[in-house]
């Protein structure tokens, strides 16, 4: 039903959405919407200019693959959380000693 970030000892789930504010999610979603056409343009431009040099070809391939994976990851991560904020009710919350003040880690029981 909901996407899960990771499991804690197979009995608890930490969801991705409560750890970040809506503002951060919206900014990353906006950047993600620009990523695909910008990636294609930059890759085509750099590949045409540097394709004669072998090491640059390897670099372009790795860099382009990383951008595509980044784009795919955020597309999958944020798409399911756009309209689900009111449906998610935590079982309990903990305050992390390493987190900012008034920042809580919400944990849901695994069902």
From Swiss-Prot:
Is the keyword Zinc in the record?
no
- Topology relative to the membrane: Multi-pass membrane protein
Please give the tissue specificity annotation from the record for this chain: Brain. In the hippocampus it is mainly localized in the granular-cell layer of the dentate gyrus and in the CA2-CA3 subfields of Ammon's horn.
Q: Membrane among the record's keywords?
A: yes
Q: Which UniProt keywords apply?
A: Membrane, Transmembrane, Transmembrane helix
Q: Which domain of life is it from?
A: Eukaryota
**Listed transmembrane segments:** 23-43, 58-78
Sorted alphabetically, the Gene Ontology cellular component annotations on this record are: membrane
Q: Where in the cell is it found?
A: Membrane
Indicate what this protein is called per its UniProt record: Putative transmembrane protein CXorf1
């Amino acid at each position: 039903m909901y996407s899960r970030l990771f499991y804690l000892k197979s009995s608890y789930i930490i969801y991705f959405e409560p750890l970040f504010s809506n503002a951060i999610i919206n900014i990353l979603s906006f950047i993600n919407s620009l990523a695909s056409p910008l990636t294609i343009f930059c890759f085509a431009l750099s590949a045409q200019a540097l394709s004669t040099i072998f090491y640059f070809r390897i670099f372009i391939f790795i860099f382009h693959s990383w951008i595509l994976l980044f784009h795919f990851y955020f597309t999958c991560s944020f798409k399911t959380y756009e309209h689900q904020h009111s449906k998610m009710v935590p079982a309990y919350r903990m305050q992390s000693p390493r987190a900012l003040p008034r920042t809580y880690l919400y944990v849901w029981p695994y069902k």
